Amino acid sequence: MSDYIKMWRKEHAQILEVLLQVLQLDIFSRVGQTKLQELKRSLEAHLKSEDLGFFPVLKKAAETDTDLRRELFLFAADMDKIAAETRAFFRKVENDSMGKDIPAEFRRISAMIKSRIFREENLLMKEYEKVTSRK
């Protein structure tokens, strides 16, 4: 397993841990709010890392692999939706951190993020390892 994949898995594990912590805490508490901000920073850093180190490798391989190209297209559309909804959630928290729908919204985006991480690790990570092992 490459160092990048190890780092990527570690970032995923950290994101999942913070998601769990927020779900277990009172989201309206000081600690809950602090964890939400930690989650926001972790997600932003992880997405930047993916954009710089992960997806360029897969996109290059997809130039000659139509199945991978199709898979990346679907993942990109899914990520656009998740990113938009996650940004909207964090804007909502910034504007009304005590909004009554915040807990339900957080559970919803948490499920989306967890599902995305699971799919990335079980599909895209394998593709990445195949592509990088050919080099």
Question: Can you say where each PLM-predicted feature lies in the sequence?
Answer:
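Small-residue-biased structural context
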Residues: 1-135
